[in-house]
A protein has these predicted regions:
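N-terminal cap/leader regions of alpha/beta-hydrolase-fold enzymes
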Residues: 5-13, 19-276
């Protein structure tokens, strides 16, 4: 199927289909492409992968962290693709320019790349991202390889709140949402803080927090847990002991393999329960 053109509503091909073999027994070879998805504000380049054969497959949105799209995230999308999901990894920074990416020192405070990323990141509020989620929902509804019906969404760092917000904004479509070391999930000064919408969620939520995280300090985690329980939200808030913000990223200094593998186990189990 190399070179096959996918054309859905509002989409155009940006490259030939490629294939990526699964790394473990029972995993599928995935087909991958980068497509443009039409949004209210332009076109959003989106990495898409799914098993090469069979289908249709349940849909999952993998929402990027602040440093943006990179091969590390594509590999994470591929891992989900090899176990049977139709995965979309959108460049949420598309409003700042096509193929907006940052150099290796993007996480170094005081660097030019960090400043450039922050200038874009601070404009990434929940409402426009929810419009992007809506655009992706419309797109997958026109794709033969994408299973109709409920979808999943998960995010890391800045996108943890986006995934939870998506479950509240689209409660009849987003059946599972997960946040991994999501930032400021409780912000009492922000009207759009994710904790305010727990009661609108119909799907299952999973919220994983790192013990050492300046962007989600322990008092906030405890407050979040209490709010979550009082709202009667289906799901779980889990604290990962000893690890730091970013623990699931293999190329990050704080990568912790046992915690990262637990995050995969929790995420895939969530999607199996809710999406199949």
């Amino acid at each position: 199927m190399s070179g096959r053109i996918f054309r859905g509503a509002g989409a155009c091909v940006q490259g030939k289909a490629r294939h990526h073999a699964g790394q473990h027994r029972g995993e599928e070879t995935v087909q991958e492409q980068t497509l443009d998805i039409a949004t209210k504000d332009g076109v959003m380049e989106t990495f898409i992968c799914h098993p090469e054969r069979g289908g249709p497959y349940p849909v999952v949105f993998l929402l990027m962290d602040a440093p943006g799209i990179r091969e590390e995230l594509r590999d994470m999308a591929r891992r989900l693709g090899t176990v049977g999901y139709y995965v979309l990894l959108p460049n949420l920074y598309y409003r700042a320019g096509r193929d907006t990416i940052y150099g290796p020192d993007v996480l170094q405070h005081g660097s030019a790349e960090h400043a450039r990323m922050r200038a874009v990141r601070t404009k990434m509020t929940i409402p426009p991202v929810m419009e992007d989620i809506g655009a992706m929902l419309r797109f997958v509804d026109g794709q033969a390889a994408a299973k109709p019906g409920p979808v999943g969404a998960h995010g890391y760092c800045m996108s943890g709140p986006y995934a939870l917000a998506a479950a509240a904004r689209y409660p009849d479509r987003v059946a599972a949402a997960a946040s991994f070391y999501g930032t400021w999930l409780v912000n009492n000064e922000a009207e759009e803080s994710p904790h305010r919408s727990f009661d609108r969620v119909k799907g299952e939520l999973y919220i994983a927090c790192a013990e050492h995280d300046d962007l989600a300090p322990l008092p906030m985690v405890e407050e979040l847990r209490g709010l979550f329980e009082r709202a009667g939200s289906p799901g779980q808030v889990e604290l990962y002991p000893t690890v730091h913000h970013g623990f699931a990223f293999p190329q990050r200094w704080c990568y912790d393999k046992p915690a990262a593998e637990r995050h995969w186990e929790r995420l895939i189990a969530l999607y199996r329960r809710r999406l199949g």
